[in-house]
C-alpha cells in the first residue's frame, strides 16, 4: 500500500466515520454532467468542515507535547479558527485566536455573527491585529507571550496547513478512492485552494490512489503564480514525510476569486443559491461558492480533461452565510 507510512503519525479521532459521498441528481441534470459531492461539511463538531481532518493530526501532536493551549490565526470569519476553538473546548484546552479583518468592513454581521459568534460560545481568547502580514512570526510572538503567562501553547498554522495537518487530506484520499469504486469513469475532483493544505494533501493521496483523475484547485485568495508554489511546497513536504515521490502537476484555476479573499462575487453567490435551491446543500461565499462557480464555468468552457463525472469536495463554511447577510 503506497500510503502505509500514514499510520506512523499520531491521530486524534474526531470525525469517527467516513463523510458521505453523494450523487447530486438535480445539479447533474441542470449541468448535463454527473456531479458528486464529498460532504466534509458534515463532520461532527461545531457545524462541521474540512479543518477537523487536519486537527486530528495537529491536536494529537499538541497533546503529545503536553500543550494546554491551542493558538491559531485567521480572518474574523475563519472556519479554521472556529473548528480549532471547538476542538479545544471539547478537550478542555484553552484557545487563543489571532484575528484580522481582511475585507476592512464595519458591517455588524461580519464582526459579530457567524463564526465570530461561535468563538465566544467556545470561550475563545480573541486577540485582534491590523493584518496577518507574517502569520507564522505573529503566532510565535503571541505564543511567547502566552507561555510567559504560565500556559503551554501549541501553535497551529493558518488553515492548519502544515505538512502534518495536510495528512488529514491524504487520509481523505483513501476514503474517496474507496467510495468512488462504483463511480464509473470519474474524471475530475474540484476543491477550493486557499491555505493549500487540503489541496496538497489530496494531490499526494490521489496521485498514488487514483492517478488518472484530474485534481483542480480553484483559488480563493491568490493568483496561480502565487498559489502554486505554496501548494507544491506542501505537496513535497507531505511526500517526503511519507517516503513517497510526488510528481503530479498542480492544476489551479484563478478566475473565480476576484475581487479578493473573503469578498463575495456574483458567480460565487449564484453558485450558493443554485446548490441551495436544487439540492438543499449550503455552500459559502468565501470558499465553496467560488469553487463551485469554477466547476460550473469549467463545464461550460470545456476546461476539464473529458466529459466524465466530477467530484466536488465540500469543505464546509455555512456559518459564514449569516455573517455575510445581506449579501446572500
Curated annotation (Swiss-Prot):
Top-level taxon in the UniProt lineage: Bacteria
GO MF term set: D-cysteine desulfhydrase activity
InterPro entries reported in the protein's UniProt record: ACCD_DCysDesulf, D-Cys_desShydrase, D_Cys_desulphydr_bac, TrpB-like_PALP, TrpB-like_PALP_sf
Listed Gene3D superfamilies: 3.40.50.1100
Alphabetically ordered keywords of this record: Lyase, Pyridoxal phosphate
Cofactor: pyridoxal 5'-phosphate
N6-(pyridoxal phosphate)lysine carried by residues: 51
Catalytic activity: D-cysteine + H2O = hydrogen sulfide + pyruvate + NH4(+) + H(+)
Record GO biological process: D-amino acid metabolic process
EC number from the UniProt entry: 4.4.1.15
Quaternary structure, from the entry: Homodimer.
Family membership noted in the UniProt record: Belongs to the ACC deaminase/D-cysteine desulfhydrase family.
Annotated function: Catalyzes the alpha,beta-elimination reaction of D-cysteine and of several D-cysteine derivatives. It could be a defense mechanism against D-cysteine.
Protein name as it appears in the record: D-cysteine desulfhydrase
